[in-house]
């Protein structure tokens, strides 16, 4: 029987060198790809059935072929490592353990489509992942050859992970999505009239699957997963489970098995109330837990696999509070280029907020929130308003009785539920959430907490400091300011 473990991405311990990675894989996939005709490699990617692991599940071979066959001969390869979907941490975990497979996959893609310009877009806060990528690039110079690979550090915004906004960041702009009718494989990087410069934009996990397909073949890759979604998937399981973590399993494992067997189930004998597949798909209720987690099966229940980040909420969860968190997150992260998106999500978020205040809660809040969410996707450049029009109404209509109770008892369930934006993971300890997200405002700035009276700077400190400044150095001025502040004289 063929050894399908060679297609798995995450080693037991992180690879500390390219040599260690190669000793495990046994073959140089990049060298093999260069010894094959690009069409032969593309045929193998097509035959493997590899689908994008970043959200939509688009066939990888189809995307590559679009760029390869584009009449413009200036082409780019772009890795989307700007992970930010709530409940997802798999790309960061992959880059910490195996950046070599990601880079090899990019080099192979470049060979197929005829590109020597490669970019990896990643959030500047991902310090460990950036360090591992840079070290891997240095160690792989011989394989990289005359290609150039640049790591581009970008902002914290959720929309940085949207592929058209990601290209804008690489070009030095804000993470604002381009018009929807210009996908990257038609208009890529640094485009100009007559030179659209198409780009392959794939998720980090997608690229990481490519080397093993080249080494072992499409048939071997298809021995894992399902016909709809071949191969393995990096699942992130968080929330109310005993063993939260990032788990690599064959695509199609039932969600119930992921929760109960892989992640240890819901603690204390509690029951699952709802599962979020990020904030991009319809929430999953207990009657759907036996669904296989591949793209097709999840679509059949009206939800989506997305980036395979599942957040489990037990039966103590108050759904209006969860809907409040989701609505606020999407409203805050909207870029305001499409007025219907920002205004619709503002309406939804504010209406749900008002249900928690006895001074503002009215019977109009529920229909107003539904209207706002459903009105958001009009002329949209990206998928964010569509997410709002799906996730928010699904929570509201699926648990309407809780919203009725909330209206009648506005202060009974006041404790907020944080949006599960995962900042770090430590095995055995679990996930840390991004504590700054709650302070983010709709203009993408951050609120600051009031300064306590005990540490407030006296209003006359500047004048007193100027009187005594003289020819003091900067360091001396800082010390003097501190002394004046502390002694009040």
Give the label of every model feature segment.
Residues 1-20, 183, 190-194, 200, ...:
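Intrinsic disorder at enzyme termini
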Residues 1-179, 429-442:
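Iron-sulfur-cluster electron-transfer modules
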Residues 47-61, 158-160, 272-282, 303, ...:
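Local cysteine-cluster metal-coordination motifs and their immediate loop/turn environment
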Residues 105-109, 251-267:
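Short amphipathic, charge-patterned alpha-helical segments
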Residues 130-251, 263:
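Hydrophobic alpha-helical positions that pack around
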Residues 472-489:
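Short, basic amphipathic alpha-helical segments that act as recognition/interaction helices
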């Amino acid at each position: 029987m063929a050894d399908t473990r060679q297609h798995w991405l995450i080693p037991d311990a992180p690879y500390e060198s390219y040599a260690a990675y190669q000793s495990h894989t046994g073959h140089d996939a990049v060298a093999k790809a260069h010894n094959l005709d690009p069409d032969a490699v593309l045929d193998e990617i097509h035959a493997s059935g590899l689908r994008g692991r970043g959200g939509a599940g688009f066939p990888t071979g189809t995307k590559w072929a679009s760029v390869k066959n584009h009449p413009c001969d200036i082409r780019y390869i772009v890795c989307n490592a700007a992970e930010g979907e709530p409940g997802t941490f798999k790309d960061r975990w992959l880059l910490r353990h195996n950046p070599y497979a990601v880079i090899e996959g990019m080099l192979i893609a470049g060979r197929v489509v005829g590109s020597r310009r490669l970019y990896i877009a990643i959030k500047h806060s991902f310090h460990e992942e950036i360090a591992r990528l840079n070290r891997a690039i240095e160690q792989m110079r011989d394989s990289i050859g005359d290609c150039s690979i640049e790591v581009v550090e970008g902002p914290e915004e959720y929309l940085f992970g949207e592929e058209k906004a990601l290209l804008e960041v690489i070009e030095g702009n804000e993470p604002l999505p381009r018009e929807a009718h210009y996908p990257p494989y038609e208009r890529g990087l640094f485009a100009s009239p007559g030179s659209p410069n198409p780009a392959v934009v794939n998720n980090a996990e997608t690229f990481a699957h490519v080397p093993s397909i080249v080494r072992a073949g499409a048939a071997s890759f298809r021995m894992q997963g399902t016909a709809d979604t071949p191969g393995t998937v990096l699942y992130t399981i968080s929330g109310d489970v005993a063993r939260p973590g990032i788990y690599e399993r064959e695509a199609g494992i039932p969600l119930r098995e992921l929760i109960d067997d892989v992640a240890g189930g819901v603690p204390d004998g509690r029951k699952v109330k709802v599962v979020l597949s990020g904030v991009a798909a319809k929430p999953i209720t207990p009657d759907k837990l036996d669904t296989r987690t591949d793209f097709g099966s999840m679509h059949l229940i009206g939800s989506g696999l997305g980036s395979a980040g599942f957040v489990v909420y037990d039966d103590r969860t108050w759904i209006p509070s969860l809907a409040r968190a989701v609505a606020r997150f999407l409203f805050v992260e909207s870029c305001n280029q499409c007025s219907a998106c920002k205004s619709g999500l503002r309406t939804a978020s504010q209406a749900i907020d008002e249900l928690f205040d006895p001074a503002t809660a009215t019977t109009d809040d529920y229909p107003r929130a539904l209207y706002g969410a459903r009105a958001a996707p009009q002329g949209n450049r990206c998928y964010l308003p569509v997410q709002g029009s799906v996730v928010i109404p699904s929570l509201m209509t699926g648990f309407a009785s809780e919203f009725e109770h909330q209206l009648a008892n506005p202060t009974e369930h006041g404790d907020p539920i944080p949006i599960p934006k995962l900042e770090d993971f430590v095995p055995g300890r679990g996930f840390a959430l991004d504590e700054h997200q709650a302070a983010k405002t709709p203009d993408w700035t951050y609120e600051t907490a009031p300064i306590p009276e005990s540490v407030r700077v006296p209003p006359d400190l500047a004048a007193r400091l100027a009187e005594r400044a003289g020819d003091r150095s900067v360091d001396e001025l800082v010390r003097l300011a501190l002394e004046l502040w502390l002694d009040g004289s």
